[in-house]
């Protein structure tokens, strides 16, 4: 299954939760989900009972769309999380959080993970001084993530950094807004990660 590239707000309405796919519109209260908090389509406002499988599938879709990960890659991450010590669901979320595009987003260099992924793909991001253009690159604690010199004054990046005054920056990164770089100081604990996903249901889905 390829990565979804369609209208992102339809996805949020279908899943019934904000996935931080539209940065400024969400912060301004202008997202389609807030205006129409029901699934798109002719019968969107009808309430229907969701099966156990449907609930499990919905949680997987939330995580996939939120982090921008295709099915094959997501399944491989789950297998890796399952081999690790500790809680499989929490391991999965922590692996997703360590993706380079997500770390760029968490540092406030992009208002959405989608824009962060574009920055990485187009070579605007350096890791420990070297250009890395792979969004799934796994960041390690202590690594320096920086926007390359020619791109630091990009209006979208600067606007993203301005918005962090309103949204804040997560505690597991240290960011220098003026020099546009940050340090991934540690792997976050699950309770620190503010995503509306019940990973337990994802584990149940893949364990069948």
From Swiss-Prot:
**Disordered: region residues:** 30-49
* Record GO terms (molecular function): rRNA binding; structural constituent of ribosome
RNA-binding found in the keyword field? yes
Q: Where is the S4 RNA-binding domain?
A: 98-161
What Gene3D superfamilies does the record point to? Ribosomal Protein S4 Delta 41, Chain A, domain 1 (1.10.1050.10), RNA-binding S4 domain (3.10.290.10)
Q: Name one Pfam family in it.
A: S4
Entry's Gene Ontology cellular component terms? small ribosomal subunit
Q: Which GO terms describe its biological process?
A: ribosomal small subunit biogenesis; translation
Q: Return the protein name.
A: Small ribosomal subunit protein uS4
Origin organism is Nitratiruptor sp. (strain SB155-2)
Gene field: rpsD
